[in-house]
Regions:
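Hydrophobic pocket/interface hotspot
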Residues: 15-19, 25, 43, 57, ...
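Hydrophobic ligand-binding cavity/cleft-lining segments
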Residues: 1-36
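Residue-level detector of beta-strand structural context in well-folded domains
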Residues: 4, 33-34, 43, 55, ...
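A conserved amphipathic terminal alpha-helix motif
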Residues: 97-129
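Hydrophobic-ligand-binding modules of eukaryotic lipid transfer/binding families
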Residues: 1-7, 55-56, 86-89, 122, ...
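Hydrophobic-ligand binding "helix-grip"
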Residues: 46-91, 97-99
């Protein structure tokens, strides 16, 4: 399990809309080459190297909570994002639970998740600085 919290200098509605607009991820996420919408509940992210991860949305509570399951050839997991208005800023609280499919990868999961989460938050921040 990996968790990251941050205070984004932007209004809740704008932060929410940025994060949930998965089709536009490639425009601002430094770790992705593209995203592909499969349906209104499923999308695929492709890394810069073209490696796909499939996401299936499991819960949407507008402007409060977004959850999805994720899977690729190396892992399965669940992501929870909680969004809270703090005046004209937004607190984000993102938690990822991931299981490596290959035992060789298990020792690296925690550090990989931390790196991914830190980059995701940094990319969000760039949109509001």
């Amino acid at each position: 399990v990996s968790n990251i919290k941050a205070l984004i200098p932007g209004e809740l509605q704008k932060v929410w809309e940025l994060v949930l607009n998965t089709e536009n991820y490639a425009a601002w996420r430094s770790d992705l080459s593209k995203t592909e919408a499969i349906s209104d509940k499923q999308f695929i992210e492709y890394t810069k190297n073209g490696y796909p991860t499939t996401f299936t949305v499991t819960l949407v509570k507008p402007y409060r909570r977004w959850e999805f399951d994720m899977e690729n050839s190396n892992m399965t997991g669940h992501w929870t994002g909680i969004f809270t208005a703090k005046g004209d800023e937004t607190e984000i609280d993102f938690t990822e639970q991931v299981k490596a499919k290959k035992w060789l990868l298990k020792p690296f999961v925690k550090s990989y998740l931390r790196k991914q989460q830190t980059q995701f938050v940094a990319d969000i921040m760039k949109n509001f600085s």
